[in-house]
Amino acid sequence: MKVYIETYGCALNRADTSLMKALLQECGCEVVSNIYDADVIVVNTCTVRLDTEQRILKRLKKIKEIVKRTNAKLIIAGCMVSAQPYTLHKLVPEASLVSPQNIHRICEVVWSKNNELLIRGERSTSRLPLHIEGKVAVIPIAEGCLGNCAYCITKIARRRLRSYPLQLVVNAVREAVRRGAVEIDLTAQDTTSYGLDLGAEGPRLPDLIREILEKVPGNYFIRIGMANPDTLEPVLDDLIEVLKEPKVFKYVHIPLQSASNHVLKIMRRKYTFEEFKRIVQHLRSKIPEITIATDIIVGHPGEDDEDFHITLKAVKELLFDKVHLAQYTPRPRTEAAAMPQVPDPVKKYRSTTLAKVIEDVGLTVNRQYINSHAKVVLTHLSFRGSVVGRLFNYKPVVLTDATPDLVGFQAYALIREATFYDLRGSLINGVVIKNI
């Protein structure tokens, strides 16, 4: 049985696809790269944003035509199955549906002669998804979250928090390092909620990272994924000690979403801006060169001009290293979708205005690195084919004179230029320090 898989969305989805590939190969299937060669077509969907949903629905219409010509079986997997099963079933009634909670049953669905609708159920944590692309490994440490944000459809799709057993994560890291990964991305919807479902005596994120560092030898670097302020704060000091470890990137991703307490309350976020600010200040006081990334949504229902300008001021004040900016889009079955909406032209104006501030702040922060010498680990190629390295704090450095065969090595670089998004540099004397 030949299976083609098409994937949309986040790191968790890419990891789920890798798990599906492994399971399919174990049950006698061949994963192919050409959709026209496939007996079975799997589309792993994402539902976090309206534009992504629309792109997937448009693609599914085209795949329906391919299925008619090739007589292939169609399976739709991923977050749209959990959050919008009726939309999918109406568009493609002949497709089997497999939610993220049922991904471990993919072989059963592929080999079934019937259309299967596996939507409900609990996610199995007996096997952990592992996605390796080049020298970068993405390892989920948990599924779901403890939040109930008014705008978020991912909560509906990924559901309640389920942490993967500590030893399973450690084993996955060991396997990734064995296969040549030099960057280990520990990912989840909220990494600092790890272990909160495992009981009072269960491991938390700092415990997990210490166990990895102790039990997995080799030259690799750990990047910690997104951590919500309310779950980060209780483990903050412990996590700071872990961040000081040589093999952990000095990097945190803490979503702010809005600096207006009025909007945060409407969003059902579990912190105030003042609490968020204290976390950022504490991190910088202990690790001065730490990189702090954040997420901001503009145009959420209830956000007025004053709220927006509070957020604008906060970005200028806190000097974030990286900001992922999103215009709010209503998602089905969410509380915010039923609220009075901010007009689209207003959302667009706020997005454009804040984007300019983000660029100015990013450029100011990154210019501090110009003419500095830095050790970098060469992790991947950019979409243009340039070699990209990472500083100790995960700042990206595009190396203009490095060749693709050097990915996976460490080197010293001279930083010559800066943009708001990355640094540009060259190898010092072309010397590679160490193969990792």
PLM regions with names:
Residues 1-194, 252, 274-285, 309, ...:
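Proteins enriched for Cys/Gly/acidic motifs involved in redox and nucleic-acid/cofactor modification
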Residues 104, 147, 159, 192, ...:
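Glycine-centered loop/turn positions within well-structured domains
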Residues 330, 338-436:
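Terminal RNA-binding accessory module
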Residues 36-37, 68, 146, 259, ...:
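Short strand-connecting beta-turns/loops that link adjacent beta-strands
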